[in-house]
Regions:
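Short, small/polar-rich loop/turn modules that mediate ligand/substrate recognition or access, typified
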Residues: 105, 110-112, 177-179
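Residue(s) in the substrate-gating loop at a strand-loop-helix junction
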Residues: 73
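Alpha-helical segment proximal to the catalytic Tyr-Lys
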Residues: 58, 102-106, 175
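C-terminal helical subdomain
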Residues: 115, 138-173, 177, 186
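Substrate-binding pocket helix/loop in short-chain dehydrogenase/reductase
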Residues: 29-30, 37-42, 68, 147
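Active-site helix of classical SDR
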Residues: 53, 89, 97
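Active-site loop immediately N-terminal to the catalytic Tyr-X3-Lys motif
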Residues: 31, 78-84, 154, 172
């Protein structure tokens, strides 16, 4: 991360935007979940966000402008049976975002920190999910069918829906927003 940051600062004369967007979901009962799977999710979903923030705040302070956008999930807002480990990581991203937003504000650092919480989005994360994990014994894994049954709008979200939210939070259009959760889920959390 430090090397990536240095190359960005060299190439662009500063660092103004960080988007932390990495995640894996390993479902299953907390009783049978392997410690290695717990730690792998923590490392990718939460430690990665921490490291991005840690290494990118100093050059943002120097640039006198910054926006950090962390990708969480609706699973960071509401629990799901057999996704406890994933819930923990995405809930951690949610509260890390709020804590860092307040730290930046209290120190008068010119950095906004916000999170995006996608719902059921048409991405490869669903390809490796076990249907039983998603809806306690359900036999569906088809994303569109799942969205139709679970999401109030009955629609599946698409990566562009999330990208537009991230773009908004990274832009000056959201200059007065920090510590905010942007939920893009077709009403799933309503």
């Amino acid at each position: 991360m430090a090397e990536c940051r240095s190359k960005s600062v060299e190439a662009y004369g500063g660092l103004h935007i960080l988007v932390n967007n990495a995640g894996i979901a390993i479902g299953g009962s907390i009783v049978t979940l392997a410690l290695e799977d717990w730690q792998r999710q923590q490392a990718i979903n939460l430690d990665g966000v921490f490291l991005g923030i840690k290494h990118c705040i100093p050059p943002m302070i120097e640039s006198e402008l910054g926006s950090i956008v962390n990708l969480s999930s609706v699973a960071g807002i509401k629990g799901a049976a057999s996704l406890s480990a994933y819930n923990a990581t995405k809930g951690g991203v949610r509260l890390l975002t709020k804590g860092v937003a307040l730290e930046c504000a209290n120190n008068r650092w010119p950095i906004r920190v916000n999170s995006v919480h996608p719902g059921i989005i048409d991405t490869p994360i669903w390809d490796k999910m076990n249907p039983e994990v998603l809806q306690g014994g359900a036999n569906i894994i088809d994303r569109e069918e799942m969205a139709e049954l679970s999401v109030p709008t009955g629609q599946l979200g698409y990566p562009l829906d999330i990208a537009n939210g991230v773009l908004f939070l990274a832009s000056d259009e959201s200059r007065y927003m920090t510590g905010t959760e942007l939920i893009i889920d077709g009403g799933l959390c309503a």
